Swiss-Prot record:
This is UDP-N-acetylglucosamine--N-acetylmuramyl-(pentapeptide) pyrophosphoryl-undecaprenol N-acetylglucosamine transferase. PANTHER family: GLYCOSYLTRANSFERASE, UDP-N-ACETYLGLUCOSAMINE--N-ACETYLMURAMYL-(PENTAPEPTIDE) PYROPHOSPHORYL-UNDECAPRENOL N-ACETYLGLUCOSAMINE TRANSFERASE 1. It comes from Paracidovorax citrulli (strain AAC00-1). It comes from the Bacteria. SUPFAM superfamilies: UDP-Glycosyltransferase/glycogen phosphorylase. The keyword Glycosyltransferase applies. The keyword Cell cycle applies. NCBIfam families: murG (TIGR01133). GO terms for cellular component: plasma membrane. One of its GO terms (biological process) is lipid glycosylation. Pathway: Cell wall biogenesis; peptidoglycan biosynthesis. It is an enzyme of class 2 (transferase). Cell wall formation. Catalyzes the transfer of a GlcNAc subunit on undecaprenyl-pyrophosphoryl-MurNAc-pentapeptide (lipid intermediate I) to form undecaprenyl-pyrophosphoryl-MurNAc-(pentapeptide)GlcNAc (lipid intermediate II). Its EC number is 2.4.1.227.
Length: 355
């Protein structure tokens, strides 16, 4: 009897790493693989991954950026402990292949995989590669990127996506039956985006009620009460929610999206084919959100507006002066920029390396 092959997926810290990792993990499981997940205790991945049915393997490690001199001084000891714990996981799980999708946890896991002679596959989600993936790409057997040129020897395949984003109707079909006010979706992410929560209600208040878009605004749990107060103060009606369960459908139903520019958000919007105003988080590491947004904006698939330039007046003018037909054009251009087979490409590489 042939035993199923085993993969150790490594991704952590943010949804931008975790959800592409889940897409790959689910694809491998569908092909008959056993999948274990290397992460850190008390993290986002520790809450999201186990309910999906994957064995969670915790090790103690976190980033050092902005943590102060004391944390930096202890880095060698913390790294040594993380290496030891990761080595124990690799020896116990005995994966046929190790797949890293970003986050600090992938560094000790990836290095110990190489030490143990395990094939290593790396995928970089952002247009500006993170430090960990820059290092691991030098020792990996296969390297993939979501954006062209992010890693020197990386093959551009796009971002691993959940199937819901690749199964939406094309923009022409979605826009064909639409009429009336524009449908505006504002997405702040799991933590919310205070700048969007403050400015969007003010912008909508500047638009005459009869021309105002129909608005759905997602804020994150911590900011939902403040968001309700902002809309009430502006005298604007909107559907307000802390989370969106079906993001793919929400993207598809919107005429225009206002959002941050994390890698997953940008590539999911492109896969669906939707027009967006991207407002990059100004404190993102290496300003990678600006580079992510520029990928679509430069192709005519959306607008790039820096947070320092975002004002209620400018946003109101854009919303009033943009017709649905123009948004369809941008949605179509966004759609042409996204590769949708990254999940399959990464899974194929795993199988080729273990054939």
């Amino acid at each position: 009897m042939t035993h199923p092959r085993t993969a150790l997926v490594m991704a952590g810290g943010t949804g931008g790493h975790i959800f592409p990792g889940l897409a790959v993990a689910e694809e491998l499981r569908a092909r008959g693989w056993k999948v274990h997940w290397l992460g850190t205790p008390g993290s986002m991945e520790s809450r999201i991954v186990p309910p999906q049915g994957f064995a969670f393997e915790p090790i103690d490690f976190s980033g050092v950026r902005g943590k102060g001199l004391a944390t930096l001084a202890l880095l060698p000891l913390r790294l040594l402990r993380a290496f030891w714990q990761a080595l124990a996981v690799v020896r116990r799980v005995q994966p046929d292949v190790v797949v890293g999708l970003g986050g600090y946890v992938t560094f000790p896991g990836g290095m110990m995989a190489v030490l143990c002679g395990k094939p290593l596959v790396v995928h970089e989600q952002n247009s500006v590669a993170g430090l960990v993936n820059k290092v691991l790409a030098g020792v990996a057997d296969r390297v993939f990127t979501a954006f062209p040129g992010a890693l020197r020897k990386g093959a551009w395949v796009g971002n691993p996506l959940r199937t819901a984003f690749t199964r939406q109707a094309d923009p022409q079909a979605r826009f064909a039956g639409r009429g009336g006010p524009l449908r505006l979706l504002v997405v702040g992410g799991s933590l919310g985006a205070k700048a969007l929560n403050d400015i969007v209600p003010q912008a909508l208040a500047l638009i005459p009620a009869e021309r105002r878009p129909v608005v759905t605004h997602q804020s994150g749990t911590a900011q939902i009460d403040a968001l309700r107060a902002n809309y009430a103060a502006a005298g604007v009606e909107a559907t307000l929610t802390p989370f969106i369960d079906d993001t793919a459908t929400a993207f598809a139903e919107a005429d225009l999206i206002v959002c941050r520019a994390g890698a997953s958000t940008v590539t999911e919007i492109a896969a669906v084919g939707a027009a967006a105003v991207f407002v990059p988080f100004p404190h993102a590491v290496d300003d990678h959100q600006t580079a992510n947004a520029r990928f679509l904006a430069d192709a005519g698939g959306g607008w790039l507006v820096q947070q320092r330039d975002l004002s209620a007046e400018a946003l109101a003018q854009l919303l009033q002066n943009t017709e649905r037909e123009a948004l369809l054009e941008r949605a179509l251009k966004a759609k042409t920029m996204q590769k949708i087979h990254a999940t399959r490409e990464v899974a194929n590489a795993c199988e080729e390396l273990t054939a």
